[in-house]
A protein has these predicted regions:
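C-terminal beta-strand edge segments of enzyme domains
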Residues: 135, 203-287
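Catalytic metal-binding/acid-base residues of hydrolase active sites
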Residues: 13, 47, 89-90, 149-153, ...
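Extreme N-terminal starter segment of soluble prokaryotic enzymes
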Residues: 2-9
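Short beta->alpha transition motifs characteristic of CBS
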Residues: 55, 103, 114-121, 213, ...
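Active-site catalytic loop in hydrolytic enzyme cores
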Residues: 93-167, 173-185, 189, 247-251
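Cys-nucleophile CN-hydrolase/nitrilase-fold catalytic domain and related Cys-dependent amidase chemistry
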Residues: 15, 22-108, 177-192
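CN hydrolase (nitrilase-like) catalytic-core segments centered on the catalytic cysteine
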Residues: 65-83, 152-233
Length: 287
């Protein structure tokens, strides 16, 4: 049985917000006409919500998870029979605040997962923090974790997602600043130390810096866009590759998830008021 999924990462310019999603459906249709074998389409952070990051503007266009807008995104996924990650949306939060929330729809159009960005880029972003990590199942293939943009600067996020069983992590990005160069290093390092695939899809110019990429669980960059152009990465994710790297080791030598022996002592982590327990140090321990 194949353990692979074909994914199209759309590095494209952000769309201005509208509750008419016909233009977005046409955008997906064009991707699928170019890459008809695509099983999953991924767009960048806030792809459908324009570039105005003022609190008032975001509050005016915030969309609830059970509302018409999100429902229509599900209908688009169902229409094309694909897994769809349409970037993130602006979602209402308590006290008149807003979340930056990634959505995942299955080919039946069901909202199967969502993730509220835990690390907004302060002080520039007005979003309130999420508080829960998100990993979802691709039936018969593997598990996928979600993070958004600045989350990649915090290694705890990727480590937690991997511990929750993620073999593929989708990093939705709208980086408009020169530190995209450093983010590329962080994406590669995060894939290496967790032995996971990472798909990092940034928006295109003129707003964002582009340079989307795919890194495999050995840390190799297998696909990348070298500029901020409107471009598509079409890639195949092989979940067997994750198992192989974890079994044989990164570069054939490093097996971080097999580091501990059964009787090793716990390691206190005062920074987190917690600890590493050698008996639970492996991916998927809380599945």
């Amino acid at each position: 049985m194949s353990m692979k999924i074909s994914v199209a990462l759309a590095q494209v310019t952000q769309r201005q917000f509208t509750d008419d999603l016909s233009g977005y459906a046409e955008e997906i249709e064009k991707i699928l006409s170019r890459f008809p074998e695509t099983q999953m389409v991924v767009h960048p952070e806030l792809h459908l919500f324009g570039s105005d990051m003022s609190t008032d503007a975001l509050s005016d266009i915030a969309q609830s998870l059970d509302g018409k807008f999100v429902g229509e995104l599900g209908e688009i996924a169902k229409r094309f029979g694909i897994w769809l990650i349409p970037g993130s949306i602006v979602e209402p939060a308590p006290n008149s605040e807003v979340y930056n929330t990634a959505l995942v729809f299955n080919p039946a159009g069901e909202l199967v997962s969502f993730y509220r960005k835990i690390f907004p880029w302060r002080p520039s972003e007005p979003f309130t923090m999420g508080s829960e990590f998100s990993v979802f199942e691709l039936p018969g293939l593997g598990r996928v974790g979600l993070n958004i943009c600045y989350d990649i600067w915090f290694p705890e996020v990727t480590r937690q997602l991997t511990w929750m069983g993620a073999e593929l992590i989708v990093n939705l990005v709208r980086t408009t600043t020169p530190d995209r160069k450093q983010e590329l290093v962080l994406v590669q390092a995060s894939a290496i130390v967790n032995q996971v695939y990472i798909l990092s899809v940034n928006a295109a110019g003129p707003i964002a810096m582009g340079r989307s990429l795919v890194v495999d669980p050995d840390g190799d960059v297998v696909e990348q866009i070298l500029d901020d152009s409107n471009s598509i990465i079409y890639t195949i994710i092989d979940f067997d590759r994750v198992a192989q790297i974890r079994r044989d080791g990164t570069a054939g030598v490093n097996r971080m998830w097999d580091q501990f022996l059964p009787n090793d002592p716990e390691i206190n982590l005062p920074i987190y008021s917690g600890r590493i327990n050698p008996r639970t140090w492996r991916p998927g321990m809380n599945r």
